[in-house]
Amino acid sequence: MKPTRRALLSAGGASALALSLAACSKSQPKTAQTQASGTPIAEPVLNDKQLSEILQRVQTGLATADKEKNADKLKEVMSGPAARIRAAEYATASASGNNDFIHPMTTTIQGGGVGQTVGFPRNAAAASEGASPSLISLEQNSARDQFKVWAWVQGFSEKKNIPVLTKQSAQRAKQVTADSTGLVSTPKAALDAYVDALNHPDGENGKAFPDDLLRQKVQAARTTNLSSLGEVTVTATAGKDGFQGLQMEEGDGGALVFTTLTYTVVYKRTVDGSDLTLQGDVAALMGGNQKIVGTVTATYDSMVAFSIPKEGSKDKVAVLGAETALIKVDRDDSKTLAPTASASAKPS
């Protein structure tokens, strides 16, 4: 699995994101050098060989955990939202008997990049091969820890339309924060705008972002047909996991940013005596009773990747991909009524 030295180009006219392995040293990382003043010099945290070896280790460990649907084994190769969302996929797959809820993540990379820092945590990113590439964010929390997958997403479009690696255009990258500057938007503002687009699809932000697969999934949930016997409310909120990614200091100067969001789908019975039954992934986590007596609330977590162009660019923030899983289902049976009408609904 030999990574190439090419840059990540985002979709929708967003600026080139230089995830170039030229940002990695050709040799083993050295101890931090210092300037004449004694201030440590930020250096690449990995070289290309090490990044490939890390991703090979991740693929092997993930294959074992996936086969057994063993969330404990994920701790060896995943952390943060990646581990939480993969564990949720295992739970839904086990409850439903359908392994399709465990979505593939490919680590054979086309290209990648690493942050330059003197401290921890340390970040790296990679884009996989394939028609629908995985975009992966890696994190090392301390010198004693292994690099682990902190987040990953599946590209929203085919390879020809979104992240493709075509050329080398940057030598340095700094790690992003929620308030990173030098971009058309801070990462936090980009996430807030996208969450607003999910909540208000006809609003200003709703019109600014393309109709991607996550937006379609949220809208499909919002329009679930309960046959006039109930109502559905969908609400998205920014996640609490923070932000990771790389901001290029040369070339186009854009940033690749990973973060999370949460959305809840509340199914409420509104007609006294009606009988509403849920199907699909939500029903699988409801145990033996799939009926809506009062309300049923499904909570989903999504990892999301953004391309944020350099400040002054005419390009806009683009959403590159997402990975979503059903985290939990809560029910409130405070009103128990005798059924007189019936309907069933399958969440999208």
Model-based region annotation:
Residues 41-93, 165-233:
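Core segments of small alpha/beta cavity-forming domains
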Residues 91-135, 234-278:
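Surface-exposed, charged secondary-structure patches
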Residues 131-189, 250, 254-258, 290-345:
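Short beta-strand edge/turn micro-motifs at domain boundaries
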Residues 272-294:
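Mixed-charge, low-complexity intrinsically disordered segments
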